[in-house]
Amino acid sequence: MKRIFVAIASAAFVLAGCSANTDLVSPNGKIAVSVSEDGHFTVCESGVVILDNASLGYKTAANDFSTGLKLAKAGKTSRIDEEYDMLAGKRLHCSNSAAERTYTFKNEAGASMQVEFRAYNDGAAFRYILSGDDMVMSEETLYPIADGTKRWMSTYSPDSYERMYPLATDGKAQKGSPYPWVKAQTQYGYPALVEPVDGHFMLITESDIRRGHPGSLLDNTDNETAYKVLLGSDSLAFKGNWESPWRTIIAGSLADIVESTLVTDLAEPSKLDDTSWIKPGVASWIYWAYNHGSQDLQLVKEYIDLAAEMKWPYSLIDAEWDLMGNGGDVYDALAYAREKGVKPMLWYNCSIGWINGAPTPKFRLNEREDRLKEYQMLKDNGVTGIKIDFFPDDKASTMDYYLDLLEDAVPYHLTLTFHGATVPRGWQRTYPNLMTVEAVYGAEWYNNNAFLTTRAAVHNTTIPFTRNVVGPMDYTPGTFTDSQNPHITSDGHELALMVAFESAMQHMPDRPSAYAELPDAVRTELMILPTVWDDTKLLAGYPGQDVVIARRSGDAWYIAGLNGRDEAADLSFSLDRLGLKDGAKVSLYADGTEQHGFTISSLDAAALKSVHCIERGGFLAVIR
């Protein structure tokens, strides 16, 4: 296969396992992309092929760019260096560097399709550019993944993305749900984590969904070893130039994957001029313990009191608040929150998905005129954020609705949480009033069936390497008591989840009595728990086994460790990457001898090299 050569200063060496005539090399020399003349490409990481001979292609109403492609032109290589700030996420200050090049292909009819490639220091990305007065029919991108290759993929659930990420070594159909009516399938949602070579990983996802874009998914129905990109909408009309979202491949070690900001690097910059009103934080949350609790003013007041007592800035009043009684209505609840110095948030049904028999309020946000009236009412009553639920799919019209909700909320200073929603694709940068997104099989599922009970520990040690890589995750961590189905993870494990899982808005799910019964030292940590991080480091771990993540807030490092095994384990790690000062002290909240309880100790940071965890256990260490 003939390849086009370009000389780049940083690539004046041969990457073992890749063509010497590599087309595009990242500024640090780690990522190499080689594009062939017939519309295929290969990605290498640290000299190792991680994606070999992937296919490019699109079909439109007027043109077929899936076969017979020939490279007509390879443009000049340019350099990208960017810095930007976030309000939340893995780190506040982000920077990225990439080499960029655009390739023009012609099909057998002579029509042109452009593909813009970027080789970043932590991955590769590409997008299609089509032109004319035409209609997109399908994307023909194919990612080959050979049998025997480890992969962690979540079966596609377009109305929620609430599935597990089980380890698999082949492309056979998977069943990602306990419900009998959910059949095994060969369609998968983003992100997908793959280990093509031992110790070398890639995470496949997408970024920069704009108006008129559907989301996409992966499908290997036709070929178990080739995953095709399917669009969430059947056809898309366009005039002039049309750019696809960025097909995104984060690559490297597990630390490279977890610490990457490539999804937001590729997204549009923030559209908000003033973000001073956006304040991430912790919220009390009534729904987990009382599914219909928002109908009861007295219960709602208990959760507002909890937020005030724990010094959490927010309290979320969930579904059915429009039916509130027992001494008053929602306006009484909002007034009570203001009296207590707690910022209230309210839940809404998006009303384009689950409608019949679904919780209320409904149809208050669909039409723009109604939406603006509702937003004004919220502002007038001191509501600072809303949670919007039950989105149906990844169609372009649904994606546009998300953007409508986000954009219209800005003048009213409303932050948004999306629940029952699509996975993050970079909007947290473009619209920083987006606090968090569910799109995860989270603690709420203890309400629905016992499926999570025996799988939570493995799941919790997988999603830091998969779902949470691409954006904030509203798992609602920290269930010390039981809901309708039990949990068998330890108290140390549950405490660690609050740091292991990144979310600008962290909803605390348990009952007020559960927090009251925690040791004083643990309660104190929860009162000052950050949700904004200056930096993030993966210290150790492997999907489904264990994970140790460090996050920095100011001068303090918070280290969360999770044991995903059904047996005790010593989690070993090094603090060398944290740059600690001599004499730094650690407050360690580790497992007790049983599921419930803690072993609390203080020690020198220099002595913190491993922590013993019981089965399905965990720990939180705070270095100040």
Label for each model-derived stretch:
Residues 16-17:
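C-terminal motif of bacterial Sec signal peptides marking the signal peptidase cleavage site
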Residues 492-538:
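Catalytic cores of secreted or luminal carbohydrate-active enzymes
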Residues 542-580, 619-622:
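Carbohydrate-binding surface patches
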Residues 601-624:
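C-terminal beta-strand-rich structural cap/linker in extracellular carbohydrate-active enzymes
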